[in-house]
Amino acid sequence: MDLFEYQARDMFEAHGVPVLAGIVANTAEEAKAAAEKIGGVTVVKAQVKVGGRGKAGGVKVAKTADEAFEYAGNILGMDIKGHTVHKVMIAQGADIAEEYYFSVLLDRANRNYLAMCSVEGGVEIEVLAVERPEALARIAVDPAVGIDQAKAEEIVDAAGFAADVLDGVIETIKKLWDVFQKEDATLVEVNPLVKTGDGRILALDGKVTLDANADFRHPDHEALEDKDSADPLEAKAKENDLNYVKLDGEVGIIGNGAGLVMSTLDVVAYAGESHGNVKPANFLDIGGGASAEVMAAGLDVILNDAQVKSVFVNVFGGITACDAVANGIVKALEILGTSANKPLVVRLDGNNVEEGRRILTEANHPLVTQAATMDEGADKAAELAHAAK
């Protein structure tokens, strides 16, 4: 789960990372009140989980509370790379002398943690990594040891920090590691980490990504979820513990197993080229236990997507046999009743496939068409979706 900047700031503060005052606002009036409370120069910052806010006009320096009101009014509701701005953060202005970069992340390729640090912050780090890779220090971090004093010293030495900021940067890096470890994050990034005119080290802009697999250790993380911006279908799927991702097509996809579902997306996209260029509408993995309730929940999510014109159920029976899947489909259609109003193409294969097909044949549901192969099912589902467009 990616956090908004204001959430990352609050998390940093809770772990002792030096930050400036920041107040989140939902309206221009709240922004003005926040600016008055903070006092002096403030920065109005759009709260979206995407980069490029400044270039899009989502970050403005306000010299007065009235300016904060004006800027917040302009920024709220703004679209930044497809993300609508629902909140702004009013942050205390800073006298910046130098800008640095620091991050610690999960290095999946090497099955390790990685710290990255540079004395050239405030820029797009991806550009710096390509154009001047020597300016970005990369230090492996042993998960069993973490970033202690010695490791922090190694990081700042590799990055080339000046002697006058070493102590402050080292202490801040250790506290950012504390955030990473104790909050079960997969990314903690500060860009920029700054030295102010009076010599302080501050984290001015932070990004945090939390590991959803560790949510059971952090019941407080639930309050950090962005329910306002969440896709309602994805939220509904999450409530039913379904692995669902909404896409932009017309053919709903249900399968068991991520690999099979991804393959199904490919064959549907290919088949769609012959049928009006229709595309998959979603990724939905119901997992191994395709019970009637699970199937009903999956169908309910997909059928509530107005873009969906047909549904392709592609299941390979393994631990869950095809007859159990077929019974689940039949019962799911009974549960959904009239809300099941779009054609379904069902392809079953694997364990007890003949019995599964017999159950669907005898049920003789008017919306269900069976397919013998995945290619046949994808072609039929694409054809039906195109006809319904």
UniProtKB/Swiss-Prot annotation:
Name the Gene3D superfamilies for this protein.
ATP-grasp fold, A domain, ATP-grasp fold, B domain, Succinyl-CoA synthetase domains
Q: Which organism's genome codes for this protein?
A: Renibacterium salmoninarum (strain ATCC 33209 / DSM 20767 / JCM 11484 / NBRC 15589 / NCIMB 2235)
Please state what the protein is called. Answer: Succinate--CoA ligase [ADP-forming] subunit beta
Essential cofactor(s): Mg(2+)
ATP-grasp domain residues are 9-236
Q: What UniProt keywords are attached to this protein's entry?
A: ATP-binding, Ligase, Magnesium, Metal-binding, Nucleotide-binding, Tricarboxylic acid cycle
The keyword ATP-binding belongs to this UniProt entry's keyword annotation: yes
Q: What does this protein do?
A: Succinyl-CoA synthetase functions in the citric acid cycle (TCA), coupling the hydrolysis of succinyl-CoA to the synthesis of either ATP or GTP and thus represents the only step of substrate-level phosphorylation in the TCA. The beta subunit provides nucleotide specificity of the enzyme and binds the substrate succinate, while the binding sites for coenzyme A and phosphate are found in the alpha subunit.
Q: Which family does it belong to?
A: Belongs to the succinate/malate CoA ligase beta subunit family.
